[in-house]
Design a protein with these regions (language model features):
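Active-site-proximal substrate-binding groove within the catalytic cores of carbohydrate-active enzymes
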Residues: 1-171
Length: 171
C-alpha cells in the first residue's frame, strides 16, 4: 500500500511512502511521528523516495528516527528529457547522481534498521528545546539518538555527530 490510508491498513503488510511530516496545523507545537510510532513493528514502513525530498539528509535522519525502510526512485535516462512532461516529478532521479549517496546512507543505517525492524517504539523524546535532538527507545532496549542540528551533541552519555545519529544497543 502507498501512503497512510487507514482503511487499507488491516490488509497491508507494507506501507510505502509513509508520511514523514506532521499535518502542518498551526495548533501543534512540535511534530511527533505518531503514524510510525503506532505502526512500527506491526507493519513494515518505508519513507518516500529520499532523492525526491527537499533535504535528503533530514529525510534520511527521519527514516532512522522512525525505523523506516529507505527508498529511492531512479531512472537511467537523462532527466532533462522529462522536463515539462507527465514525469516532471522525477527530474532528480538519475541513478548516477544518487548511487554513492544511497550506498553511504544504506551502509550507515542497515544494521540499525534490521535490528529494530520488528520492534515497537517504547519512548520518543525531544531532548532539545528546538527539537533537533531526538531519542527513540525501541522495545529491545536499543536507544537511537538523532541529531538534526549542524552542531555535535551529547545525550545519554553518547556523542551524536551533527546531522547524524548514534546507537546505544540495548540488552
Amino acid at each position: 500500500m502507498s501512503g497512510g490510508n487507514a482503511y487499507a491498513l488491516p490488509y497491508a503488510d507494507l506501507v510505502m511512502d509513509a508520511p514523514m511530516t506532521d499535518s502542518g496545523l498551526l495548533l501543534t507545537a512540535r511534530a511527533v511521528p505518531f503514524y510510525q510510532i503506532a505502526l512500527h513493528g506491526v507493519v513494515d514502513l518505508s519513507v518516500t523516495a529520499l532523492n525526491e525530498e527537499q533535504n535528503v539528509t533530514e529525510a534520511f535522519l527521519k527514516a532512522v528516527e522512525t525505523g523506516s525502510c529507505l527508498k529511492w526512485r531512479w531512472i537511467a535516462r537523462n532527466e532533462d528529457e522529462l522536463v515539462e512532461t507527465d514525469y516532471n516529478s522525477i527530474i532528480s532521479a538519475r541513478y548516477e547522481n544518487w548511487i554513492d549517496i544511497a550506498i553511504d546512507q544504506y551502509s550507515r543505517a542497515e544494521s540499525l534498521l534490521n535490528r529494530v525492524a520488528e520492534q515497537t517504539v517504547v519512548s520518543h523524546e525531544l531532548l532539545s528545546e528546538d527539537g533537533t535532538l531526538v531519542r527513540v527507545v525501541w522495545s529491545d532496549g536499543t536507544e537511537v539518538f538523532v541529531n538534526y542540528s549542524d552542531r555535535d551533541a551529547t545525550a545519554g552519555g553518547v556523542s551524536v555527530p551533527a546531522q547524524s545519529f548514534a546507537v546505544k544497543e540495548g540488552a
